[in-house]
Every structure is written in C-alpha cells, then in structure tokens.
Swiss-Prot record:
Keyword Cell inner membrane: yes
Transmembrane segments: 16-36, 45-65, 83-103, 142-162, 192-212, 218-238, 289-309, 317-337, 364-384
Reaction equations catalysed: L-serine(in) + Na(+)(in) = L-serine(out) + Na(+)(out); L-threonine(in) + Na(+)(in) = L-threonine(out) + Na(+)(out)
Species this protein is from: Tolumonas auensis (strain DSM 9187 / NBRC 110442 / TA 4)
GO BP of this protein: serine transport; threonine transport
Keyword Repeat: no
Keywords, sorted A to Z: Amino-acid transport, Cell inner membrane, Cell membrane, Membrane, Symport, Transmembrane, Transmembrane helix, Transport
Encoding gene (name): sstT
Family: Belongs to the dicarboxylate/amino acid:cation symporter (DAACS) (TC 2.A.23) family.
Name used for this protein in its record: Serine/threonine transporter SstT
A molecular function (GO) term: neutral L-amino acid:sodium symporter activity
C-alpha cells in the first residue's frame, strides 16, 4: 500500500519551479532588508548552488556531445551550421543596437585616476589566439577549468572515434550521459534555495546605492538588452520560423533567463538550458553541441556591454565618431564578444580593445572597466540572462526551421508544465 506524501512535499511538487524561484527571490529581498547579517550567511546557499552547476556542467557537456556524435546515424539532420549564423548575426545586431542607443542617449562617466590591477588582452589577435589554444587544451585541464571550447573539441573527437565502436560501448556512454542528466535535474530542483541565497547576499552587501550615480548608463545598457530580447531576437526568430515567436521567446526568458540572471554564469546555466531543450523535445544531437557552443560564442549581451561602455568613454572624452568607425566598432564588439568566455573578467576586460579604436589610452580604458565592475550587479546579471536565454531561443528556432521538430502544440503543452 503506497503512502500519501506529506502535504508540504505535495505542495512543492504541484508548484512550478519558476514560481518557487520567484518566492525565493522575495524571501531573499526580505531577509536582506530585515536581517542583513543573516542574509550574508544565506549567501552560502547561492555559492553552493552555482558551484554545483559549474561542477556538473563540464561532465554533462562532455558525455552528451560524445553520446550524440557517437550515436549519430548517417543522413540524420542537425542544425549546427544555421545556428552558427544565427549566433553571429544576433551578436552583430546587438552591437548595432548598442551603437544606435549610444548616439541617441549619450552617457558620460566620472573617471578617476584609479588603476585596476588586471591585464586586458592586447588585441583581437590575442583573443583569437587564446580561443585557438583553448581548442587544443589538455582534456583533464579543460574539464577542471570549465574550458568549454576544449571540452567540445575533445567530445567531438571522441564521439567521431566511437562511431565504429560496439553497440555495448555506445550503450554505456548513453547510460552515463543520462545518469549525469539525472544529477543535473536534482541540482536544478535546488534553484529556489540557491537563488534566495544569491539575492539575499547581493542585496545585503551592495544594495543599490552604488548604482544610482550611473543610472543613465545602466538604463541605456539594460534598455539595449531588453530591446534585443523583446524586439530584435523575436524578429530574427520570426524570419526563421515564419510564425509568432513570442511564446517561444517568453518561455526561454522565463525558464533560462531568470536562472541565468541570478547565477550570472553562462557555464552554470548550461544544464538549465539543456533541460529546457529536452522539455521542448529538441533533437539531442543538435542541442548537446549548440548549447555549450552558444555559452562560448553567442554573446549578444557582451557585445552590448563592450559597445555602450566604449561609447560612454568616447562621449566623456569628447571624441567625435563617424558612421564608418561606428560600424567598425560593431564588428570589433561582435568578434570580441565571441571571445569573452575565454577572457578572465569576461566582456569588461575586452572594453580596452574597443577603446583602442578611438586612441583611448589603456589607463583611461581601465577606469571604464572599473565603472563596469561597479554596475556589475545589474549589468552582468542582465548580460548573462540575455546571452544564455538566446542560446535556447536560437537552438529551438533553428530546429523548427530545419526539422519542424517543435510545433505550436508541443510549445503550448510545455508552457503548461512550467
């Protein structure tokens, strides 16, 4: 005779994960407001949650990609090529939006003589050089450091080598990938507690006092990201699937964007994105490659950050910018953004690269980077949410356009599950 689960467990099972996350956010804000000391302690939950996601993500990517490629049947269609085009085109469009917004609403920074103890890359060649060396990194080191370019390269090579392996070997790899996926689902169920801890500690430590002096800059930054998320990306998706894109857009923002906003890590959000792709019934051989690849090169948010902060520095110094230079800035921001995941400090440390186009010295550029760190509480969160949710969005759009693998009926059914 089966026992009835306790009422609290039933309530948890009947409440969607997104609703639980929203409750966790509210509890975190209240805790930071009423008991700041306890809120800082609660930050441990957030650190553990992000750490667990970062720990499991490299293994998940390695096994899923290896399994997908090893089990790939001759003639089976994938959507990787059109996805690469979508990723690059979407990032370039985001950079163009940021340039236009910077001309329309010029921001001015209050630069000081402070120097940051960090070293930015010397140029685009150095960024590309880092990416190429990431491809041939030691596989164990790549797993330990979360180098997803290296993990992808080794997983693809291993998968291709195992195509001629016995069915038993392929079955073992398949079972391992599903076992790790099960672990990921368990970690994701802890998201409400983790996000509560992240929100509580962030509010308790920083609040919003440091952000008020850069209100206009933040409005331009966040405004560009919202415009890309709700206007540009839907237009791109509509161009691909020829139907209303907003049910898919809103689902990706709700399930992927919300989690990414608080974890502030595209790598940590890879398991969340893969779980959403599975829920949307996308072909595993496509999303197992496209999601970790997107976490590395699909950087619309990073392109916006690089462009807006660079243009703010230009406006502050009174440098005039013509149309040709603005277009060149968009191209440089796109290429730089694709390498953001390969640079410690991400998009902010690529700002000196863009500033060098205008002859801005490294000392001044690093002051702009310092401003970026000050507003990073919101900037980095919004950037990651846009980057990560777009990975799923473009993956789903490419699959719908190529295979019709995601129908409106399936989308609505999955939306009801959330």
């Amino acid at each position: 005779m089966s026992q009835t689960p306790p009422s609290f467990i039933r309530l948890l099972n009947n409440t969607s994960l997104v609703s639980q996350i929203l409750i966790g956010m509210i509890v975190g804000i209240l805790l930071a407001t009423l008991i700041p000391s306890a809120a800082q302690s609660a930050g441990l939950l957030g650190t553990l949650f992000v750490g667990a996601l970062k720990a499991v993500a490299p293994v998940l990517v390695l096994l899923l990609v290896t399994d997908s490629i090893a089990g790939h049947k001759q003639g089976q269609k994938t959507s990787i090529r059109p996805l690469l085009i979508l990723y690059l085109f979407g990032t370039f469009c985001a950079a163009v939006v940021a340039v236009v917004a910077s001309f329309a609403f010029p921001s001015v920074l209050h630069l000081s003589a402070q120097n940051a103890d960090i070293v930015p890359p010397g140029g685009i060649a150095e960024v590309l050089n880092t990416l190429l060396f990431n491809v041939v990194a030691n596989p164990v080191k790549a797993l330990l450091e979360g180098n997803y370019i290296g993990i992808l390269a080794w997983a693809i090579a291993l998968g291709l080598s195992l195509r001629k392996a016995s069915d038993t070997t392929k079955a073992v790899i398949h079972d391992l990938s599903h076992a790790v996926s099960g672990i990921v689902k368990g970690v994701i169920r802890c998201a409400p507690l983790g996000i509560m801890g992240l929100v509580a500690s962030t509010f308790a430590e920083t609040g919003f006092s440091a952000l008020l002096s850069y209100a206009q800059l933040l409005i331009v930054l966040i405004g560009c990201m919202l415009f890309v998320a709700f206007v540009v990306n839907p237009l791109i998706v509509f161009w691909k699937i020829k139907r209303n894109p907003y049910p898919l857009v809103l689902m990706c923002l709700k399930e992927s964007g919300v989690t990414a906003f608080f974890t502030r890590s595209s790598a940590a959000n890879i398991p969340v994105n893969m779980a959403l792709c599975e829920k949307l019934r996308l072909p595993e051989e496509t999303y197992a490659v496209s999601i970790p690849l997107g976490a590395t090169i699909n950087m619309a948010g990073a392109a916006i950050t690089i462009t807006v902060l660079s243009m703010a520095a230009v406006n502050t110094l009174g440098i005039s910018v013509d149309l040709a230079t603005a277009v060149l800035l968009s191209v440089v921001a796109t290429i730089s953004a694709c390498g953001a995941s390969g640079v410690a400090g991400g998009s902010l440390l690529l700002i000196p690269l863009a500033c060098s186009l205008f002859g801005i010295s490294n000392d001044v550029a690093m002051q702009v980077v310092a401003v970026g760190f000050i507003i990073g509480v919101l900037q980095d969160s919004a950037e990651t949410a846009l980057n990560s949710s777009t990975d799923v969005l473009f993956t789903a759009a490419a699959c719908m356009a190529e295979d019709g693998s995601l129908s409106e009926g399936n989308l609505q059914e999955d939306a009801d599950i959330v």
